[in-house]
Amino acid sequence: IYQSFIDFEMESVDFDRIITGDLGAVGQKLLFELLDENHKDIKKNHMDCGMQIFDEESQDTHAGGSGCACSALMLSAVILPKLASGEWKRVLFVPTGALLSQVSANEGRTIPAIAHAVWLESGQE
């Protein structure tokens, strides 16, 4: 997200929403801290797909569920319709995901993550 702001020469206010896959409450807090260190604030327009789908209290999803599934569901059911209707004009969609491996988990290794930023626009002024 930070690198996208640099590459696109834009700020968070240039997007209606900055949407992540499924960071959960734990990941969202870390994301905000990392961006704050670089003087970037996305709190007002950030949305996490998993946090929209899951109930943290009843489902114990503090660190997220499935970024791949949450991203696909929210893209087709919420994001694209809001862009098509013109409610949102520009979205930075960052479907976050962990590259899980049973071997590396059993060996106590870290879990690598991936996130590709996709800039989506409604095409409407």
Residue spans of the language-model regions?
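Short, well-ordered amphipathic alpha-helical segments that serve as non-catalytic structural scaffolds
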Residues: 1-8, 74-79
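Claisen-condensing/thiolase-fold acyl-transfer catalytic domains that form or cleave C-C bonds
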Residues: 16-125
